[in-house]
């Protein structure tokens, strides 16, 4: 999808805020660790290449979701270690070796398939994934972990790391977290051949369970200035949202009472109202369930009225404003603010999704 450069809708990314957030989190971890910045899903909508280049001297490596995301970083000149957190099938091994990209290996079945295909794993760096209770990918017991490590090494691979992922580190009830932590700790402590890097800490763990980190952490949504729990848990220190979403009024009209607005005629004016149109819609990631939410114009919260269209939304204004008047959808404007978490709560989802859904039609600018 091509970026829509010739309209006023723009996501502004403050790269210095990301750097400061990394410094803030790392300063509160009570021991020296290796830090991997998670830049999957286009750095949670912020721009993977731009973010990686900016923080490259602050972190020890990067995590992505798949091989194509890793290749994007390599092609942009990123030379630091890159770990793919998802499973890449064995046919991707030659390219991973060629580009010095670390793979996650999550099962003995993967190893068996690599052996069946006659793959030489010399030059491959990999991390073992342990399913400690998430129920997705990973080995589920010590025997499988030992056998997987031994089998990979027998084929020439460098088994650099072992890791797990917590399902509830961002929740007030930490009982599930403690069970997963105990399972993973016991497994790692009893490995026949323990890899060099051990990591379980995502953003939430690094914030609220910093004392439990191993020797490596994966920092994701927190470096972009978002609370991993939404509003469930209070942050113990300040972080700065790195992305704001802005547009401008492209049409303003005064409608008399009784006039319908938008598809389905779901909104009808009850008195004379000033209606403004903004060039953003669900094709940009501003989804249909945001009808009834608000934007900021001139420091005032203005409700979204009528359905969100593919390319446009309509808002009720307190007065007539000139075309081109700035409008904030996320961020600060005239003393008022809207956060990604507030958008997420309106939509019944999480702040991660709000930013990840911002489409390529929305250009990003960087400060």
Curated annotation (Swiss-Prot):
PROSITE patterns: ALANINE_RACEMASE. Coiled coil: none annotated. Its cofactor is pyridoxal 5'-phosphate. It catalyses: L-alanine = D-alanine. Its EC number is 5.1.1.1. The active site is at 40 (proton acceptor), 263 (proton acceptor). Pathway: Amino-acid biosynthesis; D-alanine biosynthesis; D-alanine from L-alanine: step 1/1. CDD domains: PLPDE_III_AR. GO terms for molecular function: alanine racemase activity; pyridoxal phosphate binding. One of its GO terms (biological process) is peptidoglycan biosynthetic process. Pfam families: Ala_racemase_C, Ala_racemase_N. Keywords: Isomerase, Pyridoxal phosphate. GO terms for cellular component: cytosol. It comes from the Bacteria. The modification N6-(pyridoxal phosphate)lysine is found at residue 40. HAMAP family: Ala_racemase. Catalyzes the interconversion of L-alanine and D-alanine. May also act on other amino acids. This is Alanine racemase. It comes from Streptococcus thermophilus (strain ATCC BAA-491 / LMD-9). The gene is alr.
């Amino acid at each position: 999808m091509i970026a829509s450069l010739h309209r006023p809708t723009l996501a502004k990314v403050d790269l210095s805020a990301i750097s400061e957030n990394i410094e803030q989190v790392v300063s509160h971890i009570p021991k020296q660790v290796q830090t991997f910045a998670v830049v999957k899903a286009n750095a949670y909508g912020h721009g993977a290449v731009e973010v990686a280049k900016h923080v490259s001297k602050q972190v020890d490596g990067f995590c992505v979701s798949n091989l194509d995301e890793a290749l994007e970083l390599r092609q942009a000149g990123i030379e630091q270690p890159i770990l793919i957190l998802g499973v890449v099938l064995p046919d991707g091994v030659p390219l991973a070796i060629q580009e010095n990209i670390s793979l996650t290996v999550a099962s003995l079945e993967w190893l068996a398939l690599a052996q069946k295909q006659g793959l030489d794993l010399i030059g491959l760096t990999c991390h073992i994934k342990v399913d400690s209770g998430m129920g997705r990918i990973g080995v589920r017991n010590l025997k499988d972990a030992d056998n997987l490590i031994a089998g990979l090494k027998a084929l020439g691979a460098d088994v650099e790391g072992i890791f797990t992922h917590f399902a509830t580190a961002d929740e007030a009830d930490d009982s599930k977290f403690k069970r997963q932590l105990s399972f993973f700790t016991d497994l790692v402590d009893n490995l026949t051949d323990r890899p060099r890097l051990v990591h379980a800490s995502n953003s939430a763990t690094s914030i609220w369970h910093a004392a439990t980190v191993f020797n490596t952490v994966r920092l994701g949504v927190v470096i972009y200035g978002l609370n991993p729990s939404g509003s469930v848990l209070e942050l113990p220190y300040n972080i700065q949202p790195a992305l704001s979403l802005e547009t401008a009024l492209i049409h303003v009209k005064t409608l008399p009472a009784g006039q319908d607005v938008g598809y389905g005629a779901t909104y009808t004016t009850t008195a004379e109202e000033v209606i403004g149109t903004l060039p953003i819609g669900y094709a940009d990631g501003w989804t249909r369930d945001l009808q009834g939410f608000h934007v900021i114009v001139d420091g005032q919260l203005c409700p979204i009225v009528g359905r969100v269209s593919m390319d446009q939304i309509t808002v009720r204004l307190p007065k007539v404003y000139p075309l081109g008047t700035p409008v904030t959808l996320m961020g600060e404007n005239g003393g008022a603010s809207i956060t990604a978490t507030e958008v997420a709560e309106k939509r019944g989802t999480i702040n991660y999704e709000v930013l990840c859904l911002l489409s390529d039609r929305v250009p990003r600018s960087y400060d």
